Amino acid sequence: MTDNNQNNENHENSSENSKDHHEARAGAFERFTNRKKRFRENAQKNAESSNHETLSHHKKEHRPNKKPNNHHKPKHASQKTRNYAKEELDNNKVEGVTEILHVNERGTLGFHKELKKGVEANNKIQVEHLNPHYKMNLNSKASVKITPLGGLGEIGGNMMVIETPKSAIVIDAGMSFPKEGLFGVDILIPDFSYLHQIKDKIAGIIITHAHEDHIGATPYLFKELQFPLYGTPLSLGLIGSKFDEHGLKKYRSYFKIVEKRCPISVGEFIIEWIHITHSIIDSSALAIQTKAGTIIHTGDFKIDHTPVDNLPTDLYRLAHYGEKGVMLLLSDSTNSHKSGTTPSESTIAPAFDTLFKEAQGRVIMSTFSSNIHRVHQAIQYGIKYNRKIAVIGRSMEKNLDIARELGYIHLPYQSFIEANEVAKYPDNEVLIVTTGSQGETMSALYRMATDEHRHISIKPNDLVIISAKAIPGNEASVSAVLNFLIKKEAKVAYQEFDNIHVSGHAAQEEQKLMLRLIKPKFFLPVHGEYNHVARHKQTAIACGVPEKNIYLMEDGDQVEVGPAFIKKVGTIKSGKSYVDNQSNLSIDTSIVQQREEVASAGVFAATIFVNKNKQALLESSQFSSLGLVGFKDEKHLIKEIQGGLEVLLKSSNAEILNNPKKLEDHTRNFIRKALFKKFRKYPAIICHAHSF
């Protein structure tokens, strides 16, 4: 073949290749156009089908507020939706999917430009997802006022008022323990003065769960004021038992049993109880809808994914409200200093199994009487290792009976024995479940340890499991019980066994999850001392809540919240009332002050008889002291006081001597000054004066 022929053939082949190439490109473009057309048509059909199904579904559900999804074909700019950051339909975009147009460009400029639009769209989606507050009506003048009466600046005693100008609800009514030195005071309850002021607009008391620090004050409140009381069955069951003890059975007529996931109207509020995990059965968070916006109150909580009853926190409902837009979150701060997550209640089981398996004698397990899951687990392992179960302690027996009767737990009755039957069984066949984990002097465990219990004393071979942590303020009491148990040579499993107790409160990672689910505009950390709520504030800031949208409250503070603002508007009288738990009676503040005075400075008592004419003490006058000096020195002290009074009477005028009240005050003032000069303290003075 010649060179010319070769060139001609190459030219012909090149022309044919070029023609084939152009035909291939035309075919590819046609196929691309047809594919895009089919894509749009299918997407439109799917959207129409989805609209039809959605509309039919909403008709069945009777939810008129839900509008059919017609976003694929907006008729007017006002109909554009923010759903999935979709502002408009481009030629190459169908329902959140964009096709690439710059397929054959030489570089990547157009391709990257299209990708960048996708990045911007997804960023917009994320921003709106994290901040759904645009759904709130910022022009609304409605607001709510939050007033904590207990539970802030302290551990326990939780009580809070949420109110509008015309309506109010009270969330929880709990008790707390007194500090050392409040002699004869067993529990503290919130001051109800503010409730008396607003009683005409209180629509109800809302209970989150049945722990004592949330329900312990209810009988004392109902002795003064009565309102509808809303709660889940266990909460109302335990409150009802308290009412029986206080002679308030008739007030059960105020009880309202609620169902979770079912919003109800209470005054001007719409409230939904949302299942939450905690260290007691049937705990709830609250979704409170108001004209100003939605409020979420977590109650006490942790996020337990493997709870004993297999009923985890209802994260869906929390997220549901978060997507709708939440104005205010009030969240549990108790464990705000604890990093990570709180272990599941179910992690206790292996430790119990090991301890019960290895125990040679009796097993005595003490925990909070309200921690029914903990008690239930202990009893199950007692049964597993063929032990008879003795439940000892009034509150423990009561709570367990109520939980069984209501169907929360199921246990064979034949496994249980009474306290007076324990001695009939070998030690390795007995489990005693009892109260006293906080070292209470009247508890069953304390009385066993001090040989004061009628039927049971601690033996050297006993294994005592204290499955609880000391509440702040109770450390000394718990230590005292531990000392008694160890002196009895019992084996004690307490804090060195980290896996026999877990907290019921959320640690930092769970608090973060709650904040991310709810995405509140404003945040009020609750439940804890000031250092706890301050640490919770830092966690909230890390989760995107602006610092200016967070306020740290104390008991008595009044904070007003609206869609566009949060501010402190005042302070009301708050404080504590004292209760003698043995008599179930309140103790006047003045009595507590007198007891403190006597404890710190002692008492001096004087009953004097005066001869007015001689201006002298009669021999029948009597003096005594307590807590000032020892018995040996008391006579010398009394002689000093008598001598001083003789001098005082000689210089007293007739007006004082003839008026018993003035004579008594005159004598008291002299004794008070004399004792202060001698001891540099003011003892309590008991003085009676008579003149003849």
Swiss-Prot record:
A Pfam family this chain is assigned to: RMMBL
Top class in the EC scheme: hydrolase
Cofactor note: Binds up to 2 Zn(2+) ions per subunit. It is not clear if Zn(2+) or Mg(2+) is physiologically important.
Protein's cellular compartments: Cytoplasm
Modification comment: Acetylated on nine lysine residues. Some of the residues are acetylated by multiple different mechanisms. RimL is partially responsible for the acetylation of Lys-324, Lys-398 and Lys-650. HPB8_1270 homolog is partially responsible for the acetylation of Lys-324, Lys-398, Lys-512 and Lys-650. Acetyl-phosphate-mediated non-enzymatic acetylation pathway takes part in the acetylation of Lys-135, Lys-324, Lys-398, Lys-512 and Lys-650. Acetylation of the remaining residues Lys-141, Lys-338, Lys-548 and Lys-635 occurs by a yet undetermined mechanism.
Residue numbers binding Zn(2+) 2: D213, H214, D300, H527
Binding site for Zn(2+) 1: H209, H211, H278, D300
Region feature (Disordered): 1-91
Annotated Gene Ontology cellular component terms: cytoplasm
Compositional bias annotation for Basic residues: 57-79
InterPro entries: Metallo-B-lactamas, RibonucZ/Hydroxyglut_hydro, RMMBL, RNase_J, RNase_J_2, RNase_J_b_CASP, RNase_J_bac, RNase_J_C
Modified residues (N6-acetyllysine): K135, K141, K324, K338, K398, K512, K548, K635, K650
Regulation: Catalytic activity is regulated by the balance between homodimers and homotetramers, with homotetramers being the active forms of this enzyme. Acetylation allosterically regulates the homooligomerization state and hence the catalytic activity.
Similarity comment: family membership: Belongs to the metallo-beta-lactamase superfamily. RNA-metabolizing metallo-beta-lactamase-like family. Bacterial RNase J subfamily.
Domain remark in the UniProt entry: The first 132 residues are not conserved outside of Helicobacter. Important for protein stability. The C-terminal domain is required for homooligomerization.
Assembly and interaction partners: Homodimer. Homotetramer; dimer of homodimers. Interacts with RNA helicase RhpA, might be a member of a minimal RNA degradosome complex.
Name by which UniProt lists this protein: Ribonuclease J
Annotated organism of origin: Helicobacter pylori (strain J99 / ATCC 700824)
